[in-house]
Amino acid sequence: MYIPSHFLETDLQKISQFIKTHPLGLMVANVDGELVGNHLPFMAPNGNIAVGSKLISHTAKANPIWKIGEKKQKVLLVFSGYETYISPSSYPTKSETHKVVPTYNYLSVHINGTLSAIQDEEDKHQIVKILTEKMESSRKDPWAVADAPKDYIETMLANIVGVELLVEKMEAKWKVSQNRPARDRQGVIDDLRGNVNDPNSLEMAREIEALGGLKPGHQESE
């Protein structure tokens, strides 16, 4: 992924929290010479995500993508969020120089790794249990795998395949107006906060506000 230095994010805790908040990843793989994408929710069973850690998910057995896991094939996993259009009209400097153009702000994490397929029934049950507990943790009345009839769960497990991704490379890009002067950033924050019905805009405003000062040596490149 192309990442100018001022957009590079290396804080593993921040990256891990972002993936926890946006677990639906786009997994891209080479299948018989063609690039194939699948959207799957991935989570880390324990702690922060880093090189050497593992992410787990599952897919329908009818989806042939799991078969690349039997070959221990390399895949690319993409997580993204808070995509927000930034208008030049947000910048106070527009009225002074008019040397401004539109752009998009976003957060993105790219993970390269080796995929493995998991067919053992107990292992699949554990994957489903972990994913369910993490997804349901914020609910007032969380659902648990044990709430469903045992024979029903067994049927469901028979029709899925677990997948595990070993993280071998991870890159994170936080494009949150680091390349704009402080007053332009404030203009963007004010503009985004006006979009009260758009969660992406409000979250992006928080990300920009968290920047503080500009990173040394920032450039105006995208």
Spans of features found by a protein language model:
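Binding-site signature for planar aromatic cofactors or substrates
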Residues: M1-E222
